[in-house]
Amino acid sequence: MSFLYNTTKIRRNITALSALLIFTITANAQSGNLQGFIKTSDGKPAAEVNVQLKEIKKGTISKTDGSFQISNIPEGKYHIILSFVGLQTIQKPVSITSNQTSSYNFKLLENETELTEIVVSANRSINDIPASIGKLPIKPMDLPQAVVTVSETTIKNQQAQRLSDVIKNVNGVYLGTTRASTQESFYARGYSFSSTNMFKNGSRVNSGAMPEVSSLESVEILKGSAAILYGNVAPGGILNMITKKPKFDFGGEVSLRAGSYNLIKPAIDIYGPLSNKIAYRVNGTFESADSYRDQVSSKRYYINPSLLFKLGSRSELIVEGDFLKHEFTPDFGTGTLNDSTKGIRPATIADVPRSRFMGTNWQYNKTYQTTASVTFNHSFNQNWKLNTVLSYQQYKRDYFAVERIQALYDPQPGTWARPLGRVDTKEKYFTGQLNLNGQFKTGKVAHILLAGADADHYITNTYNYDIQGKIYDTINILDPNKFVQRTDIPVANRVTLVETPVNRFGAYVQDLISLTPKIKLLAGVRWSLQESPSNSTTYLQKNDSIAKGKFASASAFSPRVGLLYRYKQNTSFFASYSNSFAVNTGLDIYNNTLPPSIIDQYELGVKNIFCKVRLTVNLTAYKIINNNLAQTAQFDKDGNPNSNSSLKELTGQTSSNGIELDVMANFVKGLSVMAGYSYNDMHYTKTPGNKGSYVKGERLVNTPAHTANGSVFYTFSRGKLNGLKIGASAFYVGKRFGGWNNTIQQSQNYSRLIPVDGFATVDISAGYSINRFSLLAKLSNLTNTYNYYVHENYSINPIPPRQFIATFAYRF
C-alpha cells in the first residue's frame, strides 16, 4: 500500500477525530465559565493584565486583544480582581451560573498613551510570555531553548513593510539573500530558512511569497532545532507568523501609509461580534510603489477575513482565510564581473550606481497565495486541552525575465549576453495536525505533556518552456549606451508539465517534568517520514506521453532532552540536546537514494529577570554538528576512483558554533529598549578530500560571524509632550561571503567566494497621538549606507537607500 494512501487515511482520521470531538464533548454540568475584555480608557485592548477570582484564587492573564477566559468555576458569586504593576487595582462582583458562560467587560482608568509599552506591549518579561510555536503553555523561563516574540506594538512602532523589517529585532536571525527581489531568504545559526521552516498560525507556508506584515499580531522565533515539533526543518530555527484574530467587541483602524518612491498603502482592520457566540475580523490592504531601482515597481493586494465561533463554554472554532496578489518587476541587482573565458580571476561585484537596472522594460513576476484554515480548540477541563488545525494553501508563480547577471571582464569589460528565464508553477498544500496537552502529577512530580501527530501533502506542478532564442540580447552593465536594447517579448512555448508530490507524516510526544520546584526535565521524541513519490512528466508536444521519476523516501527519529535549573525565581540555567534531519538529493554508489543527514545540536544558556521585571538578559551558547554531510563519493562500487559528482556518500561534516545575547529593558514608564548580539562560526570541519568535496576549514557562504540589533522607543505620557513618541533602531551584519564554496580540484583556478563587507543601518522615528488619531514617521537607513544581499554570483541586490515613510491612522 502506498504511503500516499496511508497519509490520506491518516488525514481523514485526524479530520474525523476533530469532528467527533466537536460534536460529542459536553460541558461539566456543575460549573460555568467567565470571559470578557479589558480595555484602556480610550478603548484600546489591555494585554497581560492579571485576572483573579478572589474567593477561589483562580485566574488567568489577558491576551493581546484584551480578552480573558476562566473555565470550570463552581456556581456562585465572586469578586474579580484586575491588577497590573503600576496600575490601579480594580475589584468588581461577578456571578457564575452552571452550564453558562458569563461575560463581563472592564475598563482601566489609564488610557493607551499612559500605558504605552506597559500594557499593550506587556511589561512582563519576554521570559514570562509563552509562545504558541512551542505547542505547550510553557513560559520561556522554563523552556531549555531560546524563544523570541516580536509584538504587534514593535511592528507598528517600526512601521515594518516586509518580514525582513520584523526580523531585524531578533538577534542571530538575518536576511541573507533576495534572489531577483522575488523572495526573502532568512538565516539563523548558519542555516537557511526555507518553506519547511516558515509557518503561519502553526501551519507550514510557502516562502516564495513575501507575507503581508500588516495582518500580523506577532512573529515568533524558536531558535535551534524544532524537529520534534515540526519534522524536517533546518536546525537554525523556525518562524511562526500569528495573524490578527476576531474579537467580541467592535473596533478597528483605518490607516494610510505614504513614503519615498511613490509608496501608497491604505489599510483597514475591522472587528466585532455577529452574535454573542460569533465574532469576525477583516483586515486588508493595497500597496503601490516604485523603487530606488530604475524601472522597478510593485503592486500588492491583500485581504484576511476570519470568524470565531464559541461552541459552548469550552470549545471554539476559528475559520481563517487570506489572499495575496503581488505583481512586481524581478530585479537581479548590479551583477558581477566574471572571467569565464580564461578562468583565472574571481568574480567581483560590479561597481555601478545603486539605481541602475539591468533588466527589460517588460519582465514580470506575479505571485498569488491563497490560504484557508480551520482551528479547533477544546478544554476538557482546566488541565487538559485539545488543538486541531486543518489548512489548505495554493501558491502560483508566473515569471518571465532576463536573469543571472554574470558579465565578462574581457574582451569588453561589462559585456553581458542576457539569458532568459521562464517560471510557471502551481503548488497545493494540505496540512493537518492534532495536539493534546495536559498538566498532571505523578505523586509529587508535576508534568506538562504534549502528544500529537501531523501530516502534510504537497503537489507541485511546473511547466517547462522552450524559449525562442535562449539569449535575449547583449548589453554592457558598466556602460548601457554601448548597445541598443531589445524591447519585444520573446515567444515561449510550453513543452513539459512535471508533477512532484511530497508527503510528510510525524508523531511526537514530549513531557516537561518538574522533578523538584527548581529542577525541570524536558524529554521527548518524534518519528518523521517524508516521501517523494515518483514524479510524472507530461510531454505536451509528443502526444502527451508520461514518464515517471524515481521514488524517494526518508524517515528519522528526532529525540530531544533538556535540563533546566531554576536557581532563583528570576534566574534559570539550562542545557539541552536535540537533533534534526536533512533530506539529501543524489544517489549513493549503488544507485540508491541517500538516507537523510542527522544533525546534532547542543545548547547551554542562562535566562535572567532583574529589577522587578524591568530588565531581562538571556545568554545562549550552541554547537550544531552535521556528522554525515553528503559529499561526492571518493570511490565507486567497484573500488575505482569516482568521477561522477552525482554519486555521493555521507562522509562530510560541518560545525556551527555560536553565542547569542538578548536584552530587554523597561526602566522608565513609557520606555522600551531591546538589544541583541550574536556570534557564529560555521565551517566545513571534515571532508574526504577527493575531487568535488568541500574544502576543510572554509567558512560557509552567507554566514557572517557577527550580527547585532537594538531599538529604543519612548512615549511621553504627561505634560505638554503627552502623546509624543520618539524612537530609533539599528541593525548590523558583519563580513560574509557570497558566491559558492570552493571544492577540491574545481575547474576554476581561483576562489569562488565573493567577499562582502559588513554594514550597519540606523532608523529614526517620531510620532504623535491624540484621542483616536495618530501620526508616525520614519527615516530609514539614516546614513544612506550602501551594501548588498548576495545570492551566489548573479543576484547582487543593493540594500535600500535612505527613505522616508509616514503612517496616519484612526482607531474606532
Identify what each model region corresponds to.
Residues 3, 25-116:
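Periplasm-facing N-terminal accessory domains of Gram-negative outer-membrane beta-barrel systems
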Residues 312, 427, 446-450, 454-458, ...:
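Structural signature of Gram-negative outer-membrane beta-barrels, strongest in the C-terminal barrel
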Residues 287, 291, 306-310, 314-379, ...:
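Acidic/polar loop-and-plug regions of large Gram-negative outer-membrane beta-barrel proteins
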Residues 215-217, 228-305, 311-315, 370, ...:
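Outer-membrane beta-barrel translocator/receptor signature
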